[in-house]
């Protein structure tokens, strides 16, 4: 089911692997057997806070609003330091902006947009504490586990488009014009439009890339996924996922 101007909510029961399409504001959600995220939405009891991990607990020591050399950007591990603060505010759902790698070619600004996904199957190295012995997956899992200890559910954002970098390495994922050039959606010059296909014929390559993202989120133990601008993809795409 597509949510007008927003997205879709998909609940995935890990035991049966059955897909249930359900309405919810702004996203697509995967829930395990003990996950109550769907009921929170349906009962209007979800107190949601959106965070960009890259800046959420960044250490801007000199206060110039730039993470200079020697200053730590926000990451999975230092974000844990602020979870008690989030809990004390009565927040029970964290909407985490995209954690996928950020494209650098044609990037907007110096850091690039987190919605310009360089791929859909790995974790943004900017969000990883280089001083930790834990892997990127382990660090992400630790953050989510610490959220769960505080009764905070975690929704991870799924970008709607791919970065220009991804177009260069995987052109089969994208729509092309008559000159075989990529298509820029609206004025988002750092991303290119994915070729998801139609309700009658989906693009299996794009579908497989998104399924890899779903598998990553399930591996991390997150409670849900918000699908950004979900209505630009055919409804059959979300049903298939």
Model-derived segments and their meaning:
Residues 12-18:
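Sec-dependent signal peptide recognition
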Residues 18-26:
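Bacterial N-terminal signal peptides
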Residues 29-31:
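Boundary at the C-terminal end of the N-terminal hydrophobic targeting segment
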Residues 34-47, 52-92, 98-220, 241:
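Substrate-binding/active-site clefts of carbohydrate-active enzymes
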Residues 97-98, 228:
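Active-site beta-strand/loop signature of hydrolases that rely on acidic residues for catalysis
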Residues 155, 224-230:
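Short catalytic-loop micro-motif centered on adjacent basic/acidic residues
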């Amino acid at each position: 089911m597509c949510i007008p101007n927003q997205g879709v909510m998909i609940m995935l029961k890990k035991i049966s692997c059955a897909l249930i399409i359900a309405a919810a504001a702004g996203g697509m959600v995967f829930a395990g057997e003990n996950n109550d995220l769907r009921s929170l939405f349906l009962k209007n009891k979800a107190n949601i806070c959106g965070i960009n991990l890259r800046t959420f607990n960044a250490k801007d020591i000199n206060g110039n609003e730039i993470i200079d050399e020697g200053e730590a950007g926000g990451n999975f591990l230092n974000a844990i330091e602020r979870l008690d603060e989030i809990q004390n505010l009565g927040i029970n759902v964290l909407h985490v902006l995209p954690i996928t790698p950020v494209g650098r070619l044609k990037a907007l600004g110096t850091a690039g947009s987190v919605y310009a996904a360089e791929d859909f199957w790995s974790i943004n190295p900017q969000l990883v504490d280089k001083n930790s012995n834990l892997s990127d997956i382990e660090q992400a899992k630790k953050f989510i586990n610490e959220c769960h200890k505080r009764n905070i559910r975690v929704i991870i954002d799924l970008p709607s488009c791919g970065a220009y970098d991804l177009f260069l390495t995987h052109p089969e994922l994208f729509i092309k014009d008559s000159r075989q050039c990529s298509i820029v959606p609206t004025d988002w010059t750092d991303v290119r439009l994915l070729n998801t296909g139609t309700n009658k014929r989906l693009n299996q390559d794009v579908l497989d890339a998104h399924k890899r993202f779903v598998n990553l989120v399930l591996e991390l133990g997150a409670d849900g996924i918000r699908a950004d601008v979900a209505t630009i993809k055919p409804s059959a795409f979300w049903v298939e996922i």
